[in-house]
């Protein structure tokens, strides 16, 4: 029975369970509020810790907060240099010019060492500054190379040559056609003119003049050029000069004589001006420092024949006083007169005497013309257009040379004045070799090779 009771339960215990359940549902559902209010409140209490343990925990917390702050600052500093700068697009030329980039880097490193380090700036400003620096370095390097290879042609050699050159006007035409007259003319220019004037003087000279004469001045004539030649036919100048087809009515030309130094120029202008050579009064003047035109001592002569010569004016105005020079204005293409001239006297009082010859005939006969004589006036030339050369690029010294060259040099040199010349190396000439290379020796005449070649030639000849 006990096994059955264990399996199916005891009848007594079932009765007790039913009684307890019945008692539970039989009780009233109303809750007594007094009991609830009088019930004590339960409070959970934490276990107490020691004071030493609390202090250690506080120290660890403060140390952890400090270490976290330091780590954050280090991370921020590492992140700033790690930021990549924006790469700007560069031209193909900059990528190709490795030398320019290398020089810019070297210059940048040297500047960074000298200058103190500043605070880091924005990435955009750094990239812009680098681009500007590379552009400036590139322009400076390439600019110096290109500018150093070009030079402005200021004709400095021609200006130095003009300092040693004298102008000789009213030279007889026979100098070109006759060798004898040419030798006499060259002898006149290469001789000291002061020796001839000493014979005519009374012998009373100042000490300064004696000291100047004792100085050794060499009158070495390097070259003589003839200009203002009038030809009879309209042929090229070289062809007409070779055939000597000169104009019959024009019996005078102009010449330029170049000396070895500038010392004889002043002496020749002083003593040779107005000298008679083959019945012609020579007019000698310096090329770089010509004698000024004085309006008070000169007269204007108009209504001249186009074929008029200087000697007729010398003879016509010689009774008025000592003449310094006679200048007939001529055409640059035909080298014939334009119909007017200037006569300058040594004394201004001779001008009043020359004015009395107004409307008087210079020649007798059919070709006689009444001259129109008047005082000279200073007529300033209208300034032409400025040259195409940019004077802003030139310094003061170059501008002075340019201005002198325009007044002194001829047409051919003035046309090439101010051009940019590229500097080139010297061309190789025959016989010039480098010192490293050894010249090959000539073949010996008694050697084996020469003997065999001679024997071979004899065999073929037979």
From Swiss-Prot:
Keywords on record: Nucleus, Ribosome biogenesis, RNA-binding, rRNA processing
Gene Ontology CC: one annotated term: nucleolus
PROSITE patterns linked: RRM
Annotated spans, Disordered: 24-148, 191-215, 381-400, 432-462
Biased composition regions of type Basic residues, renumbered to the chain: 438-455
Cell compartment(s), UniProt: Nucleus, Nucleolus
Molecular functions per Gene Ontology: rRNA binding
Biological processes per GO annotation: maturation of LSU-rRNA from tricistronic rRNA transcript (SSU-rRNA, 5.8S rRNA, LSU-rRNA)
Biased composition (Acidic residues): 47-59, 125-134, 198-211
Domain RRM: start-end pairs: 297-378
InterPro entries with a match to the protein in the record: Nucleotide-bd_a/b_plait_sf, RBD_domain_sf, RRM2_Nop12p-like, RRM_dom
Biased composition (Polar residues): 137-146, 383-397
Compositionally biased spans, kind Basic and acidic residues: 108-124
Cysteines engaged in disulfide bonds, as pairs: none
Principal localisation: nucleus
Family: Belongs to the RRM RBM34 family.
Function: Involved in pre-25S rRNA processing.
PANTHER family noted in UniProt: EUKARYOTIC TRANSLATION INITIATION FACTOR 4B/4H (PTHR23236), RNA-BINDING PROTEIN 34 (PTHR23236:SF25)
Protein name: Nucleolar protein 12
Source organism (scientific name): Kluyveromyces lactis (strain ATCC 8585 / CBS 2359 / DSM 70799 / NBRC 1267 / NRRL Y-1140 / WM37)
Lineage: Eukaryota, Fungi, Dikarya, Ascomycota, Saccharomycotina
């Amino acid at each position: 029975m006990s096994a059955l009771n264990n399996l199916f339960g005891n009848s007594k215990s079932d009765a007790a369970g039913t009684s307890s359940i019945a008692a539970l549902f039989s009780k009233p559902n109303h809750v007594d509020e007094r009991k609830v209010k009088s019930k004590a409140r339960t409070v959970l209490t934490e276990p107490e810790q020691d004071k030493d343990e609390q202090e250690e925990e506080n120290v660890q917390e403060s140390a952890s907060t400090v270490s976290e702050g330091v780590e954050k600052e280090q991370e921020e500093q590492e992140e700033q240099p790690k930021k990549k700068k924006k790469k700007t697009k560069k031209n193909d030329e900059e990528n190709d010019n490795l030398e320019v980039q290398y020089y810019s880097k070297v210059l940048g490193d040297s500047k960074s060492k000298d200058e103190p380090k500043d605070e880091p700036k924005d990435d955009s400003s750094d990239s812009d500054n680098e681009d500007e620096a590379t552009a400036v370095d590139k322009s400076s390097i390439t600019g110096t190379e290109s500018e150093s290879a070009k030079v402005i042609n200021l004709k400095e050699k021609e200006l130095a040559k003009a300092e040693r050159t004298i102008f000789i006007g009213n030279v007889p035409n026979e100098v070109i056609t006759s060798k004898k007259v040419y030798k006499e003319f060259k002898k006149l220019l290469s001789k000291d003119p002061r020796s001839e004037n000493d014979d005519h003087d009374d012998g009373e000279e100042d000490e300064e003049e004696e000291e100047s004469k004792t100085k050794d001045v060499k009158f070495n004539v390097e070259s003589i050029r003839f200009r203002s030649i009038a030809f009879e036919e309209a042929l090229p100048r070289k062809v007409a000069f070779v055939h000597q087809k000169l104009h019959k009515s024009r019996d005078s030309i102009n010449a330029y004589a170049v000396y070895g130094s500038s010392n004889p120029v002043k002496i020749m202008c002083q003593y040779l001006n107005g000298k008679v050579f083959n019945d012609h009064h020579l007019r000698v003047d310096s090329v770089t420092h010509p004698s000024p035109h004085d309006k008070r001592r000169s007269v204007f002569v108009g209504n001249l024949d186009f074929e008029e010569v200087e000697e007729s004016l010398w003879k016509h105005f010689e009774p008025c006083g000592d003449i310094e020079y006679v200048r007939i204005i001529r055409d640059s293409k035909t080298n014939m007169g334009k119909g007017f001239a200037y006569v300058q006297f040594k004394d201004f009082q001779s001008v009043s005497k020359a004015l009395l010859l107004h409307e008087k005939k210079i020649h007798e006969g059919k070709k006689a013309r009444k001259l129109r004589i008047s005082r000279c006036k200073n007529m300033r030339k209208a300034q032409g257009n400025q040259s195409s050369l940019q004077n802003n690029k030139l310094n003061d010294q170059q501008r002075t040379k340019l201005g002198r060259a325009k007044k002194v040099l001829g047409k051919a040199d003035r046309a090439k004045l101010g051009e940019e010349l590229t500097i080139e190396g010297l061309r190789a000439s025959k016989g010039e070799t480098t010192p490293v290379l050894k010249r090959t020796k000539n073949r010996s005449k008694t050697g084996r090779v020469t003997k065999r070649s001679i024997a071979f030639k004899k065999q073929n000849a037979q």
